[in-house]
């Protein structure tokens, strides 16, 4: 059984509605590199290819390691009162962590310095600190889903609960290259850098 078939018990075509295409987040994602050989610009992996590959591995883990049961138990234990819409949004938040985790690699300094990407002339953005990408990825994720939550028909209590899940996921995205320490420091850094998502 495929990941989409397991998810909410609906067929694959409907599940794809919950996955946000990277093209809806980043204009011309084919211009951005995710990885290259030792930062020398050779053999670049395009960001879209990287996201697709990561998602494929997530599907494999979901199927073979029974992630669905883990997340169902997590949701039932921490937020048993969520409506059907709230549950769908909860799972959309989870699935799309994979899609958003490296979106911050659109940082012009990351592209020019780390990736040696010469596909376009990159213009540095002053409020971005060096070549960092993880906190920017978290800000883009937060910005996208905050709007979705606010536009939803969820009750105020459900929105508050979903906001907590969203913030935890943004924290995980921001730390996906390191350890998960310093949540308070993340909140401070995130509040200072939330303006980044508005730029993009």
Predicted features and spans:
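Accessory nucleic-acid engagement/destabilization modules that flank
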Residues: 3, 7-11, 18, 23-200
